[in-house]
Amino acid sequence: MVVFYPNPYLCAKFESMNNSFTIGGQIVDLVNSRIFSGVVVVNDGKIAKIEEQPVGNTRYIMPGFVDAHVHIESSMLIPSEFARLAVCHGTVATVSDPHEIANVLGKDGIRYMIENGKKVPFKFYFGAPSCVPSTAFESAGSSLDANDIEELMASPDIYYLSEVMNYPGVIHKDPNLMRKIAAAKKHDKPIDGHAPTLTGKALQKYVSAGITTDHECFQLEEALEKISLGMKILIREGSAARNFDALIPLMATHPDKLMFCSDDKHPDELDDGHIDVLVRKAISLGYNVMDVLKAASLNAVRHYNLNVGMLQEGDDADFIVVDDFKSPVARQTYIKGVLVAENGVANIKYEETQTPNIFKANFIHADDLFVPDKGKKIKVIECVDGQLITNCFTTDPKVVNGGIVSDVENDILKIVVINRYHPAKPAVAFIKGFGLRRGALASSVAHDSHNIVAVGVTDSDILHAVNLLIEHTGGVTAYCSTEMVAVPLPVAGLMSNEDGYEVAAAYENATALAKRLGSKLYAPFMTLAFMALLVIPELKLSDRGLFDVSKFAVCSIYEE
């Protein structure tokens, strides 16, 4: 039994902070789609009164931003540190899926995220991960069955059923999965989707199960079909998947069906901006300002039934102050009347944390990475910059001393995935698109089961990058013979327990080294992390071998 405790922030913990005051300016009322001059009276963290009257101040007071779908773990920061960075950009709440830590630590991991998030003045709304592990073709640290989900959905700290990735299971009515969906319906909690490229009758069956959103659309036509069936579309702009440009035309035709999200945001990018970046970009393209601001806040609040203030009397005093509502940059961020950030500086203190983890991988050796030549073509994963999907093709391999090696001139590199929960031999395949000319990259952030994934030019490079990561019991590493960078992630092998700004700087150094090694990818470590995600087409790699997503089966690396 997992026991959840009340959020002290929503109770008495922060009562000593000054959360009663009056503030005037141009009030942006998204609920009624209007802007007026007035004064907001805040009493004990609540909006006691809004008086419409002339004021001399030209600043704008508007609802804070909401990230409608994010895996906090992908920031490599614990929730309390994620909040410190996010509030500086006007974010007051997140709809958070603890799927990553659940794959490592199960319900204990979910509880860790909830309890750590309660330490700071920020509104985290966590869901119950629906697919842990996401498939049966990989090794994970834990699993959540229907009984676990029923227990979680009964908790007041769980607000929705997280993305249902197993769309074949929905279509074919897998009993265990349907029980999870039924548990969400029983407690009247929304059900999030995850159905890239799903169309036609299969999509209709998926939606008819009660699934209400999708953040995996990367084509406009796909999104329009899903909207026609009643789904809400989350426009995603993260560190790996960037679908804003393809989907933003929906703002002109279906603004009430849209929300903004980041999904996965690495720490250096979170330091630079969050949902506010999407808001400014959308407005700069000429879309209706009110529609854009609603996609960044009100639409998510209504869909997920969040207790986030929308500048209405009786609401929590959750709002931001900006100089220009057509290009909003948060000068002040308030949550429950508490000034949590001002002029880009957070007023949230660093919180110490424990470092729960499971990491039992052994150091690897050169012969573990040997791939014998069989006189056949090999299948190659082709990563796509800015997308989670991959392409695939076959080619003649480069062979040295009877073994297949990386073909640097053609950008075909060796990629490996290693079980980190039990000692096991690496699974080895080949990938195009990373562009490394020397060295190797490794990560224990490897969606969804978070085994070790690495890519490199030589077996020696891969070996050193992986063993450096194992030495730290998790993290990301960039290695070459002359320099190396490691960012330790001791919390579940996913998150750091250090100051968020220091983590962002360290990760930026690792990314910089990856690019000096030759990678042209926008976010090489984020792209690497998704090369083991078996629920997104077309060809991926698990710790058990190469995986053909269209056939939903492990396959040989050799042409068959």
Summary of predicted features, one role per range:
Residues 105-109, 135-141, 172-176, 202-206, ...:
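Short acidic, glycine/serine/threonine-rich loops at helix termini
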Residues 64-66, 126, 260, 455:
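Residue-level marker for buried hydrophobic side chains located in beta-strands
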Residues 143-162, 169-234, 239-260, 270-291, ...:
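Histidine/acidic residue-rich metal-binding segments in metalloenzymes
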Residues 98-101, 129-130, 166, 196-197, ...:
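Short, ordered loop/turn segments at secondary-structure junctions
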Residues 3-38, 42-43, 51, 87-89, ...:
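Active-site microenvironment of metallo-dependent hydrolases
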Residues 83-190, 486-488:
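Divalent-metal coordination cores built from histidine and acidic residues
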Residues 66-78, 133-146, 212:
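Active-site mouth loops of central-metabolism enzymes
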